[in-house]
Amino acid sequence: MDMRSHEMIERRREDNGNNNGGVVISNIISTNIDDNCNGNNNNTRVSCNSQTLDHHQSKSPSSFSISAAAKPTVRYRECLKNHAASVGGSVHDGCGEFMPSGEEGTIEALRCAACDCHRNFHRKEMDGVGSSDLISHHRHHHYHHNQYGGGGGRRPPPPNMMLNPLMLPPPPNYQPIHHHKYGMSPPGGGGMVTPMSVAYGGGGGGAESSSEDLNLYGQSSGEGAGAAAGQMAFSMSSSKKRFRTKFTTDQKERMMDFAEKLGWRMNKQDEEELKRFCGEIGVKRQVFKVWMHNNKNNAKKPPTPTTTL
């Protein structure tokens, strides 16, 4: 078998006025095949059409499949601004959709013509994504962020996901705190007695203050103004009447004379005499101390002079 091949390659460059001219490559292949076995002469001529390659026009197939993404449509719906946030409430103006006050690109375009609020206070909607989709997406992202970790600070939830603190119910195990130290009644069946009730006790009449008045007054003053204020506030809400000790006329006269003898104050050197006196008239020491505290101002007042004509 005898084969002859002749190949001629001609290259020609043409300048068509462009910065980068095209390259024309023409390949002409002529092949003559002699088949002596069959006795046939087959002449085959293969001609390749000329192809113009321009690297500016040739692009990879992947570049044609990638198209520029269209700009998403953004709309601003109802206004979510809470006008009572400073006082802990929840008040909305009822604006249903953002309406720019000016032309696009100006500062006035960022303010709503209906509610006069900034555009950021309105709910943002992109390509028809509603608030329910945004909530589900936020929950899904928040779950994966907590499960697998994520950098940066935690983003706040959408405004429609925020809860009003005034609408939260109290804890199920919540019980009011009772101040047993000041709220317990004495064994005798009386109610709670406060320093304020001592101040309003008064000096005259047949009913006087009991010994528990001054005892509580001394405790509250010793523990500070904070404990006294809390105890008085709790006592004002109590509906029980406080216990009062009644004195006879003879007891009041003898207590008046003995208080003037002591100078309306209890000194340490008079402690023995004070115990003996309280045992004689049948009055407790604390009861006498409270009575003296309530009546010393009235007893020290000088008598009003009488004018004679």
Swiss-Prot record:
Bias-annotated ranges (Basic and acidic residues): 1-16
Swiss-Prot/TrEMBL keywords: Abscisic acid signaling pathway, DNA-binding, Homeobox, Metal-binding, Nucleus, Transcription, Transcription regulation, Zinc, Zinc-finger
Keyword presence, Transcription: yes
One annotated Gene Ontology cellular component of this protein: nucleus
Matches recorded under PROSITE patterns: ZF_HD_DIMER (PS51523)
Superkingdom as given in the UniProt entry: Eukaryota
Major localization listed first in the record, in broad terms: nucleus
Inactivation phenotype: Increased resistance to abscisic acid (ABA) in the seed germination and primary root growth.
Tissue: Mostly expressed in flowers and inflorescence.
Record region (Disordered): 1-21
Zinc finger (ZF-HD dimerization-type) in chain: 76-125
Pfam families given in the database record: ZF-HD_dimer
Localization (cell): Nucleus
Marked site positions, Required for DNA-binding: M292
InterPro entries listed in its UniProt record: Homeodomain-like_sf (IPR009057), Homeodomain_ZF_HD (IPR006455), ZF_HD_homeobox_Cys/His_dimer (IPR006456)
DNA-binding region: 240-303
Protein purpose: Putative transcription factor. Binds DNA at 5'-ATTA-3' consensus promoter regions. Regulates floral architecture and leaf development. Regulators in the abscisic acid (ABA) signal pathway that confers sensitivity to ABA in an ARF2-dependent manner.
Subunit structure and binding partners: Homo- and heterodimer with other ZFHD proteins. Interacts with MIF1, MIF2 and MIF3; these interactions prevent nuclear localization and DNA-binding to inhibit transcription regulation activity. Binds to ZHD1, ZHD2, ZHD4, ZHD10 and ZHD11.
Protein name: Zinc-finger homeodomain protein 5
Species of provenance: Arabidopsis thaliana (Mouse-ear cress)
Organism classification: Eukaryota, Viridiplantae, Streptophyta, Embryophyta, Tracheophyta
